[in-house]
Amino acid sequence: MIKFEIGHYTNFKLPSNSTISEQLQETLRTVWDRKYDDLYERGGNSDVEEAFVEVMTAFGMPNDAISHQRYVYMAYGIALAAKPTIKHYFPEEHKADIVQAIVSCWLKDGGEIPETWADTLFPNINKIGKYQATDEAYNIFYGLLQTLNTKTAYNAILDILYDAISGDAISGFAAAQRDMFNWWLIEVIPAAYCLKLPSTLYSGKWDFPPLSQCA
């Protein structure tokens, strides 16, 4: 298995209490052991968006109540990591707080959410952020609402992953993108599979050296 020199998630190690399936574990190992051009890795020749699809296929489609909740927990954990970006630029803005309250209630009480809910709360999603980082962070919260509907949950997760890992929603350091990908693999996925939030939220405040210094 690849061991990374730089980052906070440098070794492939799943939580000791993880109960994910053997197929999913094997998929996580496989995608961990690749290098991705999209994530600014030297020698990378793999496509991270294809890895997202590969992992989510092994994770399972949201076709039943438990599988659907797993999607929501995954999206929720990523959204919480992106929330500080919104609060940094717009400390008085409360849409992220509203979404968080809605999701918390949904996880407690369940129920199907209309497909239009996300558009109702974010009618101008393409204009709301003003900066790339906040645009992408708001997109993640928009996607989080979309995961509450089984018809839109799968595509919403793929969009969330793209904005979170290959964008600036969580961290503005290009060198952090692979580390965020690793965090998703070994922290977010096992937790979501067990209907939990990750034990650690990725932080954009974690420092990284310039990309030119990363091998």
Residue ranges and their predicted role:
Residues I2-C214:
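Structured binding/interaction patches within domain cores
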